Design a protein with these regions (language model features):
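N-terminal nucleotide/polyanion-binding subdomain common to many enzyme families
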Residues: 1-94
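A short helix->loop->beta-strand "cap" motif at the edges of active sites that frequently abuts
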Residues: 39, 108, 184-186
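A short, gly/pro- and small-residue-rich
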Residues: 57-66, 174-194
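Short gly/pro/ser/thr-enriched loop/turn and capping motifs at secondary-structure boundaries
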Residues: 76-78, 172-173, 194-199
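A transmembrane-helix-recognition feature enriched in membrane-embedded lipid enzymes
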Residues: 77-80, 204-244
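Conserved beta-alpha
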Residues: 77-155, 159
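Short, flexible loop segments at boundaries between secondary-structure elements
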Residues: 141-147, 186-222
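Proline-aspartate-enriched helix->loop->beta-strand connector
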Residues: 156, 160-170
């Protein structure tokens, strides 16, 4: 049995623009407690995803069905503060890495799915060095041929991992997890570009940018093609302000 548990009272479901998000005392404890209760889906909510959920019913459904939705973005934390809910920002990449460490120490079975083939190859090499006792039962890049996905899903169900990390991008990683995880144990979590960072292909924003809540600017410099997606940030702020 897991040594770390969390009381359900430590987790309160709030709403930002109608999209559910949980205020937790400790997101790591909440995640481990969720695993101990049979597992479920973890979503890392930021302003961009919130706006996408309002426009994409399938994404909204996946977020609503998730057992744990953590406030990944500064915008979500700010929106909650306007409701009198004080929470700390909980970057999904940090929770996911912490869960990998926990998995290594507690013998959890882990599956990693997503990112480009070369990224997955480098990630496997790095994890073998950094977490030699990690039980990696399945790893697959995210550019599989359409006909390969049913077999991949079957393997996932047969292995029944304790932790499934998906780097398939929003909304695919959330909607895919909702569909495939039905009847399955373990934690299922979308991690966006985390595999690229862990593989050393990309870098996280410097800590000072995180403190000043301008990580979005660092990501935009790394990926100029994101500029259209960034337009959701002022739209999110305006929508929150309009709600009062």
């Amino acid at each position: 049995m897991d040594a770390v548990m969390t009381d359900p009272c430590d987790q309160q479901r709030c709403r930002v623009l109608g999209v559910g998000v949980d205020a937790c005392r400790d997101v790591m404890a909440s995640a481990i407690g969720l695993h101990a209760r049979g597992g479920g889906q973890i979503v890392t909510l930021n302003a961009e995803m919130t706006m996408s959920a309002l426009a994409d019913a399938s994404l909204g459904e996946a977020i609503a069905a998730a057992e744990l939705v953590i406030p990944d973005g500064a915008g979500v934390v700010w929106a909650l503060s306007r409701q009198g809910v004080r929470v700390r920002r909980s970057p999904g990449i940090e929770l996911a890495h912490g869960l990998l460490r926990y998995a290594e120490h507690h013998g959890w079975k882990v599956a990693l799915i997503g990112a480009a083939p070369e990224v997955m190859e480098r990630l496997q090499q790095r994890l073998a060095m950094e977490m030699p006792d990690l039980r990696l039962v399945l790893s697959a890049h995210g550019y599989q041929a359409p006909e390969a996905w049913p077999a991949l899903e079957a393997t996932l169900k047969a292995e029944a991992p304790d932790l499934v990390l998906l780097a398939l991008g929003v909304p695919r990683q959330e909607t895919w997890a909702l569909r495939v995880r039905q009847g399955q144990p373990g934690l299922w979590m979308g991690v966006g570009g985390s595999f690229d960072v862990w593989a050393g292909v990309k870098q996280r924003a410097p800590q000072w940018m995180s403190r000043f809540q301008v990580e979005w600017l660092y990501r935009l410099v790394q990926e100029p093609s994101r500029w259209r997606r960034m337009l959701s940030l002022p739209a999110f702020a305006w929508a929150v302000l309009r709600r009062g």
